[in-house]
Amino acid sequence: MMTYWPSPAKLNLFLYITGQRADGYHTLQTLFQFLDYGDTLHIEPRRDGEIHLLTPVNGVENEDNLIVRAARGLMKAALESGRLPAGSGADISIEKRLPMGGGLGGGSSNAATVLVALNHLWQCGLSVDELAKLGLTLGADVPVFVRGHAAFAEGVGEILTPVNPPEKWYLVAHPGVIIPTPVIFKDPQLPRNTPKRSIDTLLKCEFSNDCEVIARKRFREVDAALSWLLEYAPSRLTGTGACVFAEFDTEPCARQVLEQAPEWLNAFVAKGVNLSPLHRSLL
């Protein structure tokens, strides 16, 4: 039985760096919202206990891929708690639409979809809290995808408060470069002391991203993409980049601008949604 599972993108509608811990991790305040756009995972349960990724990613060993690591992590957690049915395994393939290094959470979303889907298909019965805790061992952004609701995040991104920001339309553009997260977070000029504010205060302020100035300075493609988008609508960086986005009140307005996109810009239009398409598929 082949099953299909959404693995949606996310946007950071704002991102503020509030400090840096002794272990080097940055503390932040950010607002996550999902998009009705993303990858699709195809998962076929096996009965021999094997995990096979049928669509390898160039340059990434299968055992290092977050998809495989998530599947093996769930298998281990369920086995240790006596909740793994004998022979549980899976063939997994992916239809990839989200760019690597784009700030859309593609890898984290893939991992979360595997955790949620296999917990369902294998009938392990792990709670959302257990899955989120497991997800955090794979990456700071995985828990928000596991929980499946737009959220205000603090700490290193793991302290989540569900929120319901307006569900606007977005033109999301990838400028053709990959930005490794450490490149931004290790930059000495990155703002690291933005004052912490309450969620109510932040939702009333104009949204921005502390990483944007560094991304624009170090990657001229990001600067060019944002300069173009800002001619049409409020626009900013998502995550540490490289993707940028402009917000619109209606789909036709977003698509009208998309039609004028320069050839060097890879862009798409999607709606912001507060309930993840993954979790909507489970309803």
From Swiss-Prot:
Residue positions binding ATP: P99, M100, G101, G102, G103, L104, G105, G106, G107, S108, S109
SUPFAM superfamilies the record matches: GHMP Kinase, C-terminal domain (SSF55060), Ribosomal protein S5 domain 2-like (SSF54211)
Keyword Iron attributed: no
Reaction(s) the record says it catalyses: 4-CDP-2-C-methyl-D-erythritol + ATP = 4-CDP-2-C-methyl-D-erythritol 2-phosphate + ADP + H(+)
Record carries keyword Nucleotide-binding: yes
GO BP terms in the entry: isopentenyl diphosphate biosynthetic process, methylerythritol 4-phosphate pathway; terpenoid biosynthetic process
Pfam family, one: GHMP_kinases_N
Record: active site: K10, D141
EC number, as in UniProt: 2.7.1.148
Pathway where it operates: Isoprenoid biosynthesis; isopentenyl diphosphate biosynthesis via DXP pathway; isopentenyl diphosphate from 1-deoxy-D-xylulose 5-phosphate: step 3/6
Record key words, sorted: ATP-binding, Isoprene biosynthesis, Kinase, Nucleotide-binding, Transferase
GO molecular function, one term: 4-(cytidine 5'-diphospho)-2-C-methyl-D-erythritol kinase activity
Assembly notes: Homodimer.
Family: Belongs to the GHMP kinase family. IspE subfamily.
Function comment: Catalyzes the phosphorylation of the position 2 hydroxy group of 4-diphosphocytidyl-2C-methyl-D-erythritol.
The protein's name: 4-diphosphocytidyl-2-C-methyl-D-erythritol kinase
Annotated source species: Salmonella arizonae (strain ATCC BAA-731 / CDC346-86 / RSK2980)
